[in-house]
Structure formats: structure tokens, C-alpha cells
Amino acid sequence: MSYVVIILVVVLIRVFIATPVKVDGTSMYPTLNNNDVLIEKKYDKSFDRFDVVVINYKKDKLVKRIIGLPGETIKISITHVGNNVVSKILVNGEVLEENYGYEPIKEAGIAANEIKLGDDEYFVMGDNRNNSSDSRVLGVFKKKDIKGTTSVRLFPLKNFGKFE
């Protein structure tokens, strides 16, 4: 009987509260690495800018950072100054101050033109901006596609703990 209770508790936790999710690829580098195992908080459905979220996309789970919130306008500006690339993310026409991007953005994708987010739409990007399939390529994501937030790394154990 006690095994049944334990199994039931574990199933309920995984279905409703939290579940492990594995990072597939380097799109969130340097924040996260390929094969890191994170805790996805399924109960957290209020999303803020810069939250790291888990998204269901077709048969995959994507781990990305929220850049644009419902109702906002997003645009990525890229200019070349000599051999240097200067990129800016604009939210409602204002430069977004953030330091999550690993390097300057080389491709704006669909965000080369302004994108007006709907009432339940989010614009997400990987921190490794030049090695990420995100909203610039895949389009915006609806709230129902975002399964939860994550801010805790389980494995590898040497990196266990909270991340931003």
C-alpha cells in the first residue's frame, strides 16, 4: 500500500507541480549548457520579462528567455560599424537594457520588422542569440504553449542551484 501512495504522490507532483526538463543544445549558453537538467515549475503561469520558460513546440520542449510580453511591439535593429555588428532589441521603440545575450545578434529574422504581440503572445529568445531557433524564426508563442518557468538546475551536480 505504501508504494502505491509514493507512486501516486510522485505522479501528482510531476503532472501538476514540477518536472525535470533536459536542455537540448546550446541555445541558452552561457546561462545553460547542453544536457543540463532543470526543474520546470508547472504551476507558475504568470510570466515576466527575462523569465526562462519551457515551451511545447511540436514534439520538442524548448527552453528560452522571455523578451517580449503581451501587447508590446518588438523589433531588432542591426547595424554594421566597420567590422563590428551592433544589435539592439527594441520594445515599444525603446532599447531593451539586458545582458543575457552571449554576443551581438547577427540575424533579426522576422523581428527585422516590428512585431505587435497579441494579448496572449510572447517573444522569446535563446541567450546564445546566433545559435538559437527562437521567435525570430519560429514566430511568437501563445501563453498556452508555455508550460512553466525554470530557475533551478539539478544536474550536473557541480552546477546545482538557481540561475537567472
Locate predicted features.
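N-terminal Sec-pathway targeting helices
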Residues: M1-I7
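Soluble "head" domains of membrane/secretory-pathway proteins
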Residues: V4, F16, Y29-E164
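Hydrophobic alpha-helical segments, principally membrane-spanning helices and signal/leader peptides
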Residues: V9-V10, D127
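Aromatic-capped interface at the extracytoplasmic side
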Residues: V11-Y29
